[in-house]
């Protein structure tokens, strides 16, 4: 029986089907999971985390390599299936929780140190989830993550490109990201309408540039990109009463758009005291 056929039969036996509300697209191509495991550099004894294990297509190869895996799964209907699949393979710890609400810093401390994360992320939450993971950057050593290709391209885009945005800048502060490989729609059940891509994310112990207040930095970046076609002096009006003076003090041309600013320039702006009154 093909791997695809086995997954379909497994779902039928447990009375399950992919849940659109949870953004479930189960991996049915057996060649993909080993490549994700390899990209993440998983080895025996690693502290491994998976988000959205689904029917275990990636979970089992992770268990075979590491011996133990902690997996965050929101859909409680999948938990019995996962326990059956993992029996005799390795030690699987299931955390029934919304991945967007997990305190990954606390989880890493509980497991003994930084984690290696491997995941076929639910597409409907992939962007906010990536931001949440970045908020807990110290909890991770590295990641191998599957996104829609369009989202994956945004993570490591260059200034001036169409894909460059707030998410790119946030990622650049704490991570080195490289493209791993593309995955066609036929690798999933159900098949999505778009191509997917797996990226490798290497977390850094120190930020790439000095940022005095990270929350303020993120607020500045989001405000700058909120209206992409507008200049900085216009987009930053939402958070600063005198953006022209602020930009001038930071040494940044207010006629520029956010999409051309580098990470260093965003840090420079965020680190420059903001005027508290209008001109």
UniProtKB/Swiss-Prot annotation:
It catalyses: adenosine(1518)/adenosine(1519) in 16S rRNA + 4 S-adenosyl-L-methionine = N(6)-dimethyladenosine(1518)/N(6)-dimethyladenosine(1519) in 16S rRNA + 4 S-adenosyl-L-homocysteine + 4 H(+). Gene3D superfamilies: Ribosomal RNA adenine dimethylase-like, domain 2, Vaccinia Virus protein VP39. S-adenosyl-L-methionine binds at residues 25, 27, 52, 73, 98, 120. Its EC number is 2.1.1.182. It comes from the Bacteria. One of its GO terms (cellular component) is cytosol. Keywords: Cytoplasm, Methyltransferase, RNA-binding, rRNA processing, S-adenosyl-L-methionine, Transferase. InterPro entries: KsgA/Erm, rRNA_Ade_diMease-like_C, rRNA_Ade_Mease_Trfase_CS, rRNA_Ade_methylase_Trfase_N, rRNA_adenine_dimethylase, SAM-dependent_MTases_sf. GO terms for molecular function: 16S rRNA (adenine(1518)-N(6)/adenine(1519)-N(6))-dimethyltransferase activity; RNA binding. It is found in: Cytoplasm. Belongs to the class I-like SAM-binding methyltransferase superfamily. rRNA adenine N(6)-methyltransferase family. RsmA subfamily. Specifically dimethylates two adjacent adenosines (A1518 and A1519) in the loop of a conserved hairpin near the 3'-end of 16S rRNA in the 30S particle. May play a critical role in biogenesis of 30S subunits. This is Ribosomal RNA small subunit methyltransferase A. It comes from Magnetococcus marinus (strain ATCC BAA-1437 / JCM 17883 / MC-1).
